[in-house]
UniProtKB/Swiss-Prot annotation:
The keyword Cell membrane applies. One of its GO terms (molecular function) is proton-transporting ATP synthase activity, rotational mechanism. It is a peripheral membrane protein. Produces ATP from ADP in the presence of a proton gradient across the membrane. The catalytic sites are hosted primarily by the beta subunits. Its main location: membrane. SMART domains: AAA. This is ATP synthase subunit beta. It comes from Wolbachia pipientis subsp. Culex pipiens (strain wPip). Belongs to the ATPase alpha/beta chains family. It comes from the Bacteria. NCBIfam families: atpD. PROSITE patterns: ATPASE_ALPHA_BETA (PS00152).
Amino acid sequence: MSTGKVVKITQAVVDLKFEDGLPKIFNALKSKLKYKGKELVLEVSQHIGDNIVRCIAMDSTDGMSRGDEFVDTGAPISVPVGRSTLGRIFNVVGELIDECGPLKGKYDLEPIHRSPPSFTEQKIQEEVLVTGIKVIDLLAPYLKGGKIGLFGGAGVGKTVLIMELINNIAKAHKGFSVFAGVGERTREGNDLYNEMITSNVIDINEHEKSQAVLVYGQMNEPPGARARVALTALTMAEYFRDHENQDVLFFVDNIFRFTQAGSEISALLGRIPSAVGYQPTLATDMGAMQERIASTTAGSITSVQAIYVPADDLTDPAPATTFSHLDATTVLSRQIAEMGIYPAVDPLDSTSQSLSAEIIGEEHYNVASEVKRILQTYKSLQDIIAILGMDELSDEDKIIVDRARKIQKFLSQPFHVAEVFTGMSGKFVSLSDTISSFKGIIEGKYDHLPEAAFYMVGSISEAIEKAESIKAEVGAGH
């Protein structure tokens, strides 16, 4: 294999000169020396003439100097795939970082850059994925084999929601789950790992009994690692789909950091930025990854992606580019979070392609449509209420406002993963309970119950119990 020498280092971007044969684009180069006790991997990104290639480093370039030698491996970054990866934590280049010893059993190595499945291989599923979260199951249901996006600004609950989805779906799910931590907090990665051990999704004593693989490239990593770690995780998920014929759950937190890392690299590579300083290849980079997340005749990949929205602006190029790839969008709103309603999902902004009578059934569709109509009417009446007060509304509008406020409160729900913060036990609500509960509210069956009874409960039976305890407290007070 040919050897190149470092001629220039610019943070995460390194130029190397090869005298005997240039490595191909996307090839991995390995260092002859060790930096901080381990080999450094570079990925070839550009050929810039005079036998010089420009590469992206997958780890810190601290300690590197001009003249250091790197060897062309002759292939892209290749990572372990297969059942022996279950229960383990990997980094971007497929090295184990959980300190639980080497991989046991057989495994293959697969390159992280691949083509998406062809048209003839792809398959559409029309089966709803029940999450146990009322607002999602009722108003923006997820499809098995679909792509789901959780949009939200800083601190509105994206990671808590994705962890609850992992808790609710991965536990009940018989297949495998792959989690990609892309440029997020290391503490959250550690919390998730411990949560998975507690809930038996990962068995640290017998890894082969685990149901999940974790791949981390966190905030402290250089942009090369953050830009490629989602592809590493996706390669592992694709193997389970194609070779094990599994229905795989693929979680990404956070897809915005993938774009952000691409933007950092793009600037270091000397490309002219496009709108809002993003890389000119934003749509291409996103498309190349998203098209690989597909369901085929062999198996399916259902992906749930958290998407940070800079400055709460959904028209920012990064979230806007991601929107076009998704089947369902769950939008988290700061206004709803400020009202103390968690999960802070905006019921009117969130969308789903599966919200049609053919897929979810006539009753579910009618209840969801009526709930949205009531909430929309309440939203349009809020200006009148703010200026003139409730007394100026017609009797019909007063009933709508009353029901809308109950619906709003009832869309809140205590989460299993947030029990330590809320002090309330988490609730998983079945789809039939969700539909019948909301049907009762819109038909006026629960108009006599106080608004507070609907807040932070699971099914309607809990709201009725809460109403009785409120009544008893008020009675005792008198």
